[in-house]
Design a protein with these regions (language model features):
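Extended, folded cores of ATP/NTP-driven motor/assembly subunits in large transport
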Residues: 3-400
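Glycine-rich phosphate-binding loop of nucleotide-binding enzymes
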Residues: 49, 65, 73, 80-88, ...
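Pre-P-loop entry segment of helicase/translocase ATPase cores
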Residues: 387-399, 403-422
């Protein structure tokens, strides 16, 4: 009899263990997606996201200012200066969350033009060709002091509205086109992030299965790679906003993290870049205490730490730089049957060549994914997910490039870009939205078979049919 009782008890325990393994405990993780947003409201055309922890955010859609393969070093530094200016404008209690969404698509002509036979055949040739596209969003979030939850402060709210418009004006003055997402657009963007689907017109949600390495959802899975391991920060001593590659024995500058748009097998990549703006006086005081603590125990590692802190304090005093808490992660989405280890190997090898060793202990996959939702960045763990650095150094790790797109011009001359898909350019430099010159003369020169006849045919069509 005792044996039967023991066997029944063991069977019950096995059943409970199987249930917990398959369906979870039904605790906090079960409702983790329900505990993010309170609502999304419209405020004078701006979609404002309210989180259940009391923060509110606005989303700016923008285009990165540096054209890929432009070899313009100054433009990389100009972006760093712009970001430093935005940090100064926002000040304490705000966070800047930049999301670069890299998407693998198939080419299709969406111009809705009634092409003649020759042009129609041209576009049919490229239909279905895979290429990489990119979208960029900048999310401004105001922190809510947890002790003041459920107490509305009209002054802070008005300050938030003023500052987000200041940010938009600053970016416009710097030549970076931006616009705020409305309420419906913000909702769609959040849904697309949740579904990890940025290319289909209709999206659907699926069940999530989470383990220590990946997050599976329907016919796809993703993995979150934290760029910096807080316990052992492996970054180069000197960071620049660009790195050099060799092209035909010539050095060419590219973005420091340009590798994010060429990850093998990836269908979608989201590069999350977060800057949290703390109280500067408090952080300097904490740095001073840390320096004194290291100095009280003289050994080689502590002496190096003291020297590093002194250098930072000297830069802040001389150049009025700002301290920020930072977090960077990559969310890589692949088909369910793809080998995610290939993406891991590619990222580890590529970043190690830059002197950056990505974290191998990002076991909190679900928490990193949820805290990377637009407007939910303050959910990042203060002790484990954020590290303190200067705003200039953090800006170097941001993605600054955009892929060349079709120009806004009535004189569209199509050539293929480096990915092999048609892109329209204005060869005159004076008909498009962005004027390069007010007068231009040109002639067509090229060897046999290079496309001179087709080129002149397009120009004749546009000019003599009065399409300009």
């Amino acid at each position: 009899m005792v044996l039967y009782v023991i066997l029944i008890f063991i069977a019950i325990l096995i059943g409970m263990a199987t249930s917990v393994y398959a369906f979870g405990t039904g605790g906090k993780r079960k409702k983790i997606f329900q505990d993010i947003y309170f609502s999304v409201e419209d405020c004078n055309g701006i979609g404002v996201l309210y989180t259940k922890t009391g923060e509110y955010s606005a989303i700016l859609k923008m285009e990165n200012p540096v054209q890929k393969y432009s070899a313009n070093i100054d433009s990389y530094y100009e972006f760093n200066h712009l970001l430093a200016a935005l940090c100064q404008t926002l000040g304490e209690g705000y966070a800047i969350h930049k999301q670069d969404v890299i998407i693998r698509k198939q080419f299709h002509d969406d111009s809705n033009d009634n092409h003649e036979f020759l042009s129609e055949s041209y576009f049919k040739y490229f239909t279905g060709r895979p290429y990489t596209d990119a979208e960029t969003y900048l999310i401004i979030t105001q922190e809510n002091k947890k002790s003041r939850f459920l107490s509305f402060d009209g002054k802070k709210w008005n300050e938030f509205l003023v500052k987000i418009r200041k940010v938009q004006d600053q970016m416009k003055d710097s030549g970076v086109p931006t616009r705020f997402l409305g309420r419906d657009e913000a909702r769609v963007y959040v849904d697309r992030y949740f579904a990890m689907n940025f290319k289909d017109k209709t999206i659907s949600m699926s069940n999530f299965k989470v383990d220590d390495e990946t997050i599976s959802m329907g016919d796809k899975k993703c993995k979150v790679y934290s760029l910096v391991d807080i316990d052992s920060i492996n970054l180069p001593g000197i960071l620049r906003p660009f790195t050099n590659i060799e092209v035909n024995n010539t050095s060419m500058p590219v973005d420091l993290v340009s590798l994010v748009d060429s990850i093998p097998s990836a269908e979608v990549v989201i590069y999350n870049q977060m800057l949290f703006l703390p109280n500067q006086k408090r952080e300097l005081s904490l740095l001073d205490k840390k320096k004194n603590r290291h100095a009280s125990m003289p050994n080689p590692s502590n002496l190096i730490a003291v020297e590093d802190i002194k250098k930072v304090q000297d830069i802040i005093a001389r150049e009025n730089k700002q301290l920020v808490y930072s977090h960077f992660n990559l969310i890589v989405g692949v088909p369910i049957d793809a080998d995610i280890q290939k993406c891991t190997n590619h990222l580890e090898n590529s970043f190690s060549r830059l002197g950056i060793h990505i974290s191998k202990r990002a076991y909190n996959q679900l928490e990193l994914f949820v805290n990377s939702f637009p407007g939910n960045c303050y959910g990042m763990n203060q002790d484990y997910d954020r590290f303190l650095t200067l705003s200039d150094a953090a800006a170097c790790l941001m993605y600054k490039e955009h892929i060349q797109h079709t120009e806004d011009t009535p004189l569209k001359i199509y050539y293929t870009d480096r990915q092999g898909v048609p892109v329209a350019i204005d060869i005159s430099g004076k008909e498009g939205k962005n004027k390069i010159t007010d007068n231009s003369n040109f002639f067509c020169l090229g060897p046999s078979g290079s496309g001179k006849s087709f080129h002149m045919h397009v120009i004749w069509t546009k000019t003599h049919r009065k399409e300009l």
